[in-house]
Amino acid sequence: MMDNLQKYKPTDKMIDLISDNYSLLQVMSRFGLSLGFGDKTVKEVCEMNGVDCRTFLVVVNFMAEGFSRMDGETDELSIPALVDYLRQAHIYFLDFCLPAIRRKLLEAIDCSENDVSFLILKFFDEYMREVRKHMEYEEKTVFKYVDALLQNNAPKNYQI
């Protein structure tokens, strides 16, 4: 079913996927796929790296097209692969992306002249704290619960 609905397919060359959409390099990185795959297909690259191809393609197609063409594609996802992807995304946002945005804000505003600059930084820092809090909750609670579900060992009194 995926072949008919999605933009990217297992038989596509990985290089074509990247050439078409450079932002998918981040998705590759979060799945542990590195460059140097030559002329191999998406399926071949995933198999070489022990990555669930269907899950990789669902994420890639979601990033490229959003929810618009995802009907029925989530039934065969690898939940462990998806959780690992989300963990890597958290690391990227918390350790790289958000600090880089803050540095750019500091470069762009003059903190010595007015209170507006200070308020912008304060607002961004509060936003970063909320994002960190949310992602830490997912790491410590949600992902732990998902792992327990996968092992048929879910706590009976837990709700997300």
Question: Which residues does each predicted region cover?
Answer:
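Small-residue-biased structural context
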Residues: 1-160
